[in-house]
UniProtKB/Swiss-Prot annotation:
HAMAP family: TrpD (MF_00211). One of its GO terms (biological process) is L-tryptophan biosynthetic process. Homodimer. It is an enzyme of class 2 (transferase). Gene3D superfamilies: Nucleoside phosphorylase/phosphoribosyltransferase catalytic domain, Transferase, Pyrimidine Nucleoside Phosphorylase, Chain C. GO terms for molecular function: anthranilate phosphoribosyltransferase activity; magnesium ion binding. Belongs to the anthranilate phosphoribosyltransferase family. Its EC number is 2.4.2.18. Mg(2+) 1 binds at residues 91, 225. This is Anthranilate phosphoribosyltransferase. InterPro entries: Anthranilate_Pribosyl_Tfrase, Glycosyl_Trfase_fam3, Glycosyl_Trfase_fam3_N_dom, Glycosyl_Trfase_fam3_N_dom_sf, Nuc_phospho_transferase.
Length: 341
């Protein structure tokens, strides 16, 4: 199938959902060569990925991951990355706030690819054991309401793709598949994208996936998160129907002060870990505000509240009551205990 797919792509022809799924199945089963994988990824990038191609690839990659089955539906909040802005770990900080609201969070992430500090890097710097197996992460999610799935542990079949990706050295569809391939089958998702056009594709791809409620967000300043330095664009999907498309949200409308992008910049893992802990401990300022905004959007996705404005108030209450910090401390303690046997 991969040879036929490459032939179609170089002619500018898009693949169907089923064709792209068949190609990914061959790749994940180790039935393709590195040269074929490199040619496929390059041809797909040059043509430009369609929503159906993205969904077909993502559905198989998720199915081939090491799965986690939870007793209740879970939420994931993640930025695709690649915005080049180097903010602190906004989504990761927000994850503890969301968990503090009683939403089960299955955070799926990796080390930094294009930024200085990925979710895995900052969690490790906080003392969390990031390389837990599926059963151990499930215990974290069920017992304390939040767990972290380190992508290399949960996607062993990516070993077939890694050499080709490294050798061709360009951004490929795999750079955007991570947020769509949560091993716990997150039914609720907030996904940040670095470009508007990518938001259009991702929300359309989610229509072909097993998702109950999702928001795709983009800061018009370039952030792959909701921004407080300018307006943000959101796309919303509920029960496989797109109900918002390129809807604009202003921080001022939400009662938040608009600040420069510099105010939410981050650094290396140790610095970002201190920032995360300070925010969850109640520190005020722009970094708290951007976490409140993104946590609020995720709380709306989880159907905890009806509007983002309502979610901001709830997120602030969760932080100020110490519930978010408690989730962080609990995950540090439990992950270390599980890792030590």
């Amino acid at each position: 199938m991969i040879k036929e797919a490459i032939g179609s792509l170089v002619l500018g022809k898009s693949l169907t959902l089923e064709q792209s799924a068949s190609v990914m199945d061959e790749i994940m089963e180790g039935k393709t060569t590195p040269a074929q994988i490199g040619a496929f990824l390059t041809a797909l990038r040059v043509k430009g990925e369609t929503a159906e191609e993205i969904a077909g690839l993502a559905n198989v990659m998720r199915a081939k991951s090491t799965r986690i089955s939870t007793s209740t539906p879970v939420l994931d909040i993640v930025g695709i990355g690649g915005d080049g802005i180097n903010t602190f770990n906004i989504s990761t900080t927000a994850a503890f706030v969301i968990s503090g609201a009683g939403i089960k969070v299955a955070k799926h992430g990796n080390r930094a690819a294009s930024s200085m500090c990925g979710s895995a890097d900052v969690l490790e710097a906080l003392g969390i054991k990031i390389d837990l197996n599926a059963e151990q992460v499930k215990i974290c999610i069920e017992q304390i309401g939040i767990g972290f799935m380190f992508a290399p542990v949960f996607h062993p079949a990516m070993k077939f793709v890694a050499p080709s990706r490294r050798e061709i050295g360009i951004r490929t569809v795999f750079n955007i598949l991570g947020p769509l391939t949560n091993p716990a089958s997150a039914q609720y998702q907030l996904i940040g994208v670095p470009e508007i056009g990518l938001g259009d594709k991702i929300i359309s791809a989610l229509c072909h996936m097993d998702i109950k409620h999702a928001l795709v967000v983009h800061g018009l300043d370039g952030m792959d998160e909701m921004s407080i330095s300018g307006d943000s664009v959101i796309w919303e999907l509920k029960d496989k129907e797109i109900i918002k498309f390129r809807h604009t949200v202003s921080p001022r409308e939400m009662g938040l002060e608009q600040v420069s992008l510099q105010a939410v910049k981050g650094g290396a893992a140790e610095e970002n870990a201190l920032t995360l802990r300070a925010i969850l401990s109640g520190a005020k300022g722009p970094k708290r505000d951007v976490v409140l905004l993104n946590a609020a959007a995720a709380l709306m996705v989880a159907d905890k509240i009806d509007t983002i404005a309502e979610g901001i108030s709830l997120a602030a209450e969760i932080i100020d009551n110490g519930l978010a910090l408690n989730k962080l401390e609990s995950l540090i303690k439990l992950s270390q205990s599980l890792a030590s046997g």
